Amino acid sequence: MALLQIAEPGQSPQPHQRRLAVGIDLGTTNSLVAAVRSGLAEPLADGDGKVILPSAVRYHPQHVEVGESAKLAAASDPFNTVLSVKRLMGRGIADVHQLGEQLPYRFAAGESHMPFIETVQGAKSPVEVSAEILKTLRLRAEQTLGGELVGAVITVPAYFDDAQRQATKDAARLAGLNVLRLLNEPTAAAVAYGLDQKAEGVVAIYDLGGGTFDISILRLTGGVFEVLATGGDSALGGDDFDHAIADWIIQQAGISSDLDPSAQRSLLQAACAAKEGLTNADHVELSHGDWRGTLSREQFEALIEPMVARSLKACRRALRDSGVELEEVSAVVMVGGSTRVPRVREAVGELFGRTPLTNIDPDQVVAIGAAIQADTLAGNQRGEGEELLLLDVIPLSLGLETMGGLMEKLIPRNTTIPVARAQDFTTYKDGQTAMMIHVLQGERELIADCRSLARFELRGIPPMVAGAAKIRVTFQVDADGLLSVAARELGSGVEASIQVKPSYGLTDGEIARMLQDSFQNAGDDKAARALREQQVDAQRLIEAVEAALQADGERLLDAEEREVIELQVQELRDLLASNDGLAIERQSKRLSQVTDAFAARRLDSTVKAALAGRNLNEIEE
């Protein structure tokens, strides 16, 4: 008799078999794939034994080349070789023009202002280019592990916004990968170090890669990784070090900065080689065309000092946001190839007062942490006592527009995700049957100073007096940091929703600027918000009084009384355009006082009309 093999939902019917899942570090300069094998997370090598895959894609008429060979062809075939595509993920064509010289490609605008790179195979989007890198890593993993993958955890900078995260997920799907989760790169590093060293306390993750910088302050307690605060710069990395050296060479050689793409590639390759050489040497020899020169480590450190200072400023801001003092930080983890620069390690050590941890290869630590998380999400059993919980946070507050152009925050920045928050709102005018929901991101009090994410309309609200309808708006951020918003009128049940997928992301430095502006303008913003609220309340009062005058003015007021009220209404209306909040408040009170008697008469009239023709017994019943 045959036996029916059964298993608990979500478990393998053969528990000794592990589901194959990987962690992928999709980097600006280099990418890696790692997996847990025999209980240890390790990067997976290609056929030549190399674990690092340069994030370079070269397009030929009939095929695509990815990795080291593509990178080497960048100087000879710059238009068909795409480097640092991560900088373009989720960006718009306007952002591309701002990057200018750093991107020697031929661009064309596509749908929703998405930039496309012109190649011999036609126009390619950043998502398609990234998909080629991910596809190469997927094939490497499947060949090494000997089977198909159930999914992958892909890391992204903590500062990636919704558009950039969605673009990453789209690239993964195009590459044939099931995304188990998008994981913030600093959090992935914490996973790797937390499991290896059983660390507890407050840890700073300093992540300086090729194109982005992230700083995260985490509290590690009993296997729980809680991100207290994040910060960074979406346009700061090792590529900027290369450009600093390239600019120095141009100045020293006395040549024009207006180089053709091939010469620009050659110059940047020479600059990158010099940067790497100065990690262990005191000076390096350089050449460009007929020029020969020497760059010392001291000169190099002077060139990059402003960039290092920018990263340290972000560190101090993240510490302030987390409420943690410098002396409370028990460890500093270095992540990213650019942290090999001696001056970077020295400056970070000086700031935190301790030697940074570099136990795990800074190029590999993120992929290793992602592999550990992927192994867990795939359902593979962990060893006893190795439970793992990750608590990421959102980098900027999320909210919506209210009357007066005000930003009402529903989810404050640094809130742990996944999260859902709801708040009730109401209508502003009598008979209002629709409401525009304007979703915003930012720290300022006025919508003009925040970033618009999306708009959608809730229709079918039953007509009723202003303030009677109750509309519940729910914001939900999933584990990948993607936002969905729903609005529902509680009485009728009508609802509308939207998943926020902006057509392109924030411009370079915009997130950092938004945070900095919020700190610098906090006092002014509160005053401006108070003024707007007073103006909205005053406008509502004016509309209510005018509606009452139109309905009952002739019947309940004599000419003199009506003239007094209308005069006070006009004075308040004249004040609305001013910035004198105190005067608006005083005049609103004055108008309320002069209409008290009118309001009482209207109430009496309404009660009399309701009781007319009815006896006492009917009323008591």
Curated annotation (Swiss-Prot):
Species: Ectopseudomonas mendocina (strain ymp) (Pseudomonas mendocina)
What's the protein called, per UniProt? Answer: Chaperone protein HscA homolog
Q: Which SUPFAM superfamilies match?
A: Actin-like ATPase domain, Heat shock protein 70kD (HSP70), C-terminal subdomain, Heat shock protein 70kD (HSP70), peptide-binding domain
Pfam family name, one = HSP70
- Asked if Secreted is a keyword of the record, the answer is no
Sorted UniProt keywords: ATP-binding, Chaperone, Nucleotide-binding
InterPro entries cross-referenced by the UniProt entry: ATPase_NBD, Heat_shock_70_CS, HscA_NBD, HSP70_C_sf, HSP70_peptide-bd_sf, Hsp_70_fam, ISC_FeS_clus_asmbl_HscA
Q: Which domain of life is it from?
A: Bacteria
**Known PROSITE patterns for this protein?**
HSP70_1 (PS00297), HSP70_2 (PS00329), HSP70_3 (PS01036)
PANTHER family for the chain = HEAT SHOCK PROTEIN 70KDA
Spell out the CDD domains in the cross-references. ASKHA_NBD_HSP70_HscA
Stated role: Chaperone involved in the maturation of iron-sulfur cluster-containing proteins. Has a low intrinsic ATPase activity which is markedly stimulated by HscB.
